[in-house]
Design a protein with these regions (language model features):
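Sequence contexts marking disulfide-bonded cysteines in secreted/extracellular proteins
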Residues: 30, 154, 209-211
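Surface-exposed, charged secondary-structure patches
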Residues: 116-167
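Short, low-complexity, disordered segments immediately C-terminal to signal peptides
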Residues: 2, 12-13, 17-22, 29-52
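Short, highly charged C-terminal tails/helix-capping segments
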Residues: 34, 91-99, 201-207
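Extracellularly exposed regions in secreted/surface proteins, prominently low-complexity, repeat-rich
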Residues: 170-213
Length: 213
């Protein structure tokens, strides 16, 4: 996203930046780097690995994958809600994001509300591909906590952003679908192995968008 500081007309520049709606503006990506190469051992959330028997309890890795998959949907829903209604408290984002991702999303939403813009419509999650699961929880105080890396294909064809006069500011060149790679971390793994997950950063991927479902 283009920097808006240093411009002579901050209000107009920010409105134009929001109108362009790059992927990270919608996904709320932080600036943390992430690899864009796709590991060969990835699995799609739509095709869960079969267990040996139906009575086998899920492994820790499977629990982490399921939690991350649900979090992707919850994350976009929370982002949509706070951008659609200025009265929605930003603290709701703390339930789905943490660290740089949370800070980036809070800043973007505050700036959007400040200039009178708001979102209309909901983002749709089309596909989720789990890239890796690392359950190392050896040093939580140093940030060494369980993580899941996942690629999410989103669809914003039903999403618009309007200004205070109700006029759309979305660029006609906006891509309606694309991929973002998210890192999901659980800093409360021992106490909350299922619901302690939060998105810590995200990065757009330069690859062909998924097909609309």
């Amino acid at each position: 996203m283009e920097q808006v500081s240093g411009m002579t007309n901050t209000r107009r520049t920010l409105a134009l930046a929001l109108a362009a709606l790059p992927v990270c503006a919608l996904a709320g990506c932080s600036d943390d780097p992430a690899s864009t190469t796709t590991p060969t051992d990835s699995t799609s959330s739509s095709s869960p690995s079969p267990s040996s028997t139906s009575s086998d309890p899920p492994t820790d890795s499977e629990v982490a994958e399921q939690a991350a998959t649900q979090l992707a949907t919850d994350y976009f829903a929370a982002v949509d809600h706070v951008r659609q209604d200025v009265k929605e408290p930003l603290k709701q984002l703390m339930k789905v994001a943490i660290g740089g991702q949370l800070a980036a999303q809070e800043l973007l939403t505050r700036n959007q509300h400040k200039v009178g813009n708001r979102q209309v419509g909901d983002t749709r999650v089309v596909d989720i591909v789990i890239q890796s699961v690392n359950l190392d929880n050896s040093d939580p105080t140093a940030g060494r906590v369980p993580t899941v890396q996942m690629d999410v294909c989103w669809d914003v064809s039903d999403v618009d952003v309007v200004n205070s006069q109700g006029k759309s500011i979305v660029s006609p060149d906006r891509a309606d679908r694309g991929w973002t790679r998210f890192t999901v971390a659980n800093h409360r793994w021992k106490a909350q192995p299922e619901d302690g997950w939060r998105i810590s950063n995200g990065q757009d991927l330069k690859k062909a968008p998924c097909s609309a479902a």
